[in-house]
Amino acid sequence: MKVSERYKRLYHYTTWGGLVGIIENRCLWATHHRFLNDYSETLLLKDKLIELAKPIVQEESRKFVDGHPDQRRIMKIIETSSGFDAVVDHNTDVLVRGMYATVPSDGPYITSFCGESKDEYINANGMLSQWRGYGQDGGFALVFDTQRMGCMLVKEYERLAYSHIELDRVVYSNDEERFKEEFEPRLSNLRGFIEGMIRCIHEGALDPMVQNHENAFRDFASCMSRYKHRGFKEENEVRICAFPAIRDEKDGLDKDQLKPEKERTFRTKNGEQVPYIELFKTLDQDLPIERIIVGPHQNKEARVSALRVMLHGTSIKV
C-alpha cells in the first residue's frame, strides 16, 4: 500500500525558525543519515543482517572446504581457529560490519514526518510527545498533503541527479509482519552480493556479483534508514530517503545526458558541520502545506496571529 493511501496527510514538527525557513524558501531540509539525532538507530538492523548472512556464509564456506584439493590441511587450520562454527560466526560479523562501512558515503539524506493518527484529537492538535521535545520554546506542525508531496518528489527526481528517492513508512523493531513484507524482498537482493564476497575471500578474486552491487546496497541503505526501535512506534514515522547520485555513478554518460548535480549544503550543529540537501528548492513551486498547528506555548495566540499575517494570501490554514 502506498503511503498516500494509508496517510492522506503527513505532519512535520519544527521550530519557529524552521517554519519560517520552510515557508520562505519553499523547501525541506533532508539531513545526512550519519548526522541524525540518534545515528545508532541505523545499527538496529545488524542482527537481522546476521540472520540473513550466516546461513549463506556457512553454505559457501562448506562448499569451499569440500571442494578444496587440500581439504585435510584446510580443516586442520579451521580446527585450530576454534572450529568451523566459530569461523563462520567471525566471517559473518566481519561481512556485516563491512556492509555498514561501504554504505554510499553521500546518502541517504532523510526528512521525517509523522503519519496521521487514528485519534482525531491528535490529528487536530498534534502529538503530545512531539510537543514535549520543544520545551518552553514551543513548536509547530506543518500538515502536508501526502499525494501532492509524492508528486513533487517525482519532479525532484526527474530534474536533478538522484540515484533514488522514496517516501515510505518506518518499520518498527517489534513488527515482524511488516519487516517480512517490506524488507525481506529488498534484503534478499543482498544474497548474491554476500555469496560473491565469500567467494572473493576464499578464492582471492573479484566476483562479478560484488562488482555489480549498487542496487543491492541501495536497498540495504534504505532498509537501514527505515528501521527503528519499537519505543518510537507511536510516531507513525514516514521518511523521505533521498540518494543524490555520486560522480562515479554518472561516469560514462554524455554531458547532455547528465542531470544537474544536487547541491550539498552544510550547517553548524553543536560545533560540527552537518551535511544536508534542500528538497524542492529548484522546482519553483509552493509546498503542499494544508495547515499549520501551533503547539503549546505561553504566547500561543500571539503566534497564531503572527502566522496569519505571514500566510496572508496563501491557502494555508492556521
Question: Language-model segments: which ranges?
Answer:
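Partner-binding and oligomerization surfaces adjacent to conserved cores of proteins
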Residues: 1-318
